[in-house]
Amino acid sequence: MASITACVGNSRQQNAPLPPWAHSMLRSLGRSLCPLVVKMAERNMKLFSGRVVPAQGKETFENWLIQVNEVLPDWSMSEEEKLKRLMKTLRGPAREVMRLLQAANPNLSVADFLRAMKLVFGESESSVTAHGKFFNTLQAQGEKASLYVIRLEVQLQNAIQAGILAEKDANQTRLQQLLLGAELNRDLRFRLKHLLRMYANKQERLPNFLELIKMIREEEDWDDAFIKRKRPKRSEPIMERAASPVAFQGAQPIAISSADCNCNVIEIDDTLDDSDEDVILVVSLYPSLTPTGAPPFRGRARPLDQVLVIDSPNNSGAQSLSTSGGSGYKNDGPGNIRRARKRKYTTRCSYCGEEGHSKETCDNESNKAQVFENLIITLQELTHTEERSKEVPGEHSDASEPQ
């Protein structure tokens, strides 16, 4: 050992670098002494209880925070181990509050731990600020009541330290604000109100912070278990249909059957540029039971020469127009009836006789004789149309029956 010391001393006097074996020895010595130094520092750390007047052997919050900030850089360990060592320095209310906070937030870091300690036990705020923060602390949307009570306790301790609330009234004030600012189930709310009425003059009998947390968590566990038992299980096809609606995805007809009326309602999806009203057809599934000659029921009457039959794109047939004696719908078999739509007519000008515009927007400068001639031609066409319809009176009704 003496030779090693002499060699190290001579090397340092000559400003020469240390040999490799010296570096290895110093690293081993540091690894051996580091845990011992940390344990000695832990034994010398003062404890903090969270009380307004610290007991013998306990420190104020400011002194406790100073020594924690001094030893934290020397703790070369995980965040979880650091939190465990910090918890060992707490006693009384401070330990219980931080234990509950850690239970509510399993991923709590050291920085968040110290920030919460400052909020609960740090410097007192002004009386006006502390008063406003406490009485304006409300339960957030989706927040559990147990977590809300922890937030409320932080503001309550600040208000007590600011001197606006008496410590002997803490239990009553906590309960009153909880009933005002939290959404509780009916049973728990009734129990807490009953306790307030029963012990109005014996506030020491009211539940304190820890007892209140226990009551709330028992109710939350019961509610969670009850909801899991009563929650209905949805079938797989229904959820898939709800997740991916079929509306406006194609022209495939949808049939809705009813056991009471034995009929089908056929619907074909519209295109985006079709603004016409649709005709909904309700046809019996059993044509043999329908009285002879009775026309099928329609949701709304349509002129027979104003309908357009639209087939599904999956069918081989193309779109077809109905004639003046057409029925307005197509029957490909039992229960396979397509819905009909109105035909879009072009506009004819009564002034010049051309199509594509009306009389009010006509730009042609024709004489009155031309106007009268066009009018006579139009009247003749209407007369011939009426005569042809009278010659075949039963053509409409015969063609409208489904085959």
From Swiss-Prot:
Q: Where are the CCHC-type Zn fingers located?
A: 347-364
Residue ranges for the region (Disordered) are: 312-337, 382-403
Going by the UniProt record, its keywords in alphabetical order are: Metal-binding, Zinc, Zinc-finger
The transmembrane residues are none
Which segment of the chain is annotated as a signal peptide?
none
Q: Which GO terms describe its molecular function?
A: zinc ion binding
Q: Which InterPro entries match?
A: PNMA, PNMA_C
> What GO cellular component is one of the record's annotations?
nucleus
Q: Which stretches are tagged as biased composition: Basic and acidic residues?
A: 383-403
Q: Which family does it belong to?
A: Belongs to the ZCCHC12 family.
Protein's UniProt name? Zinc finger CCHC domain-containing protein 18
Which lineage do the record's taxonomy fields give for this organism? Answer: Eukaryota, Metazoa, Chordata, Craniata, Vertebrata
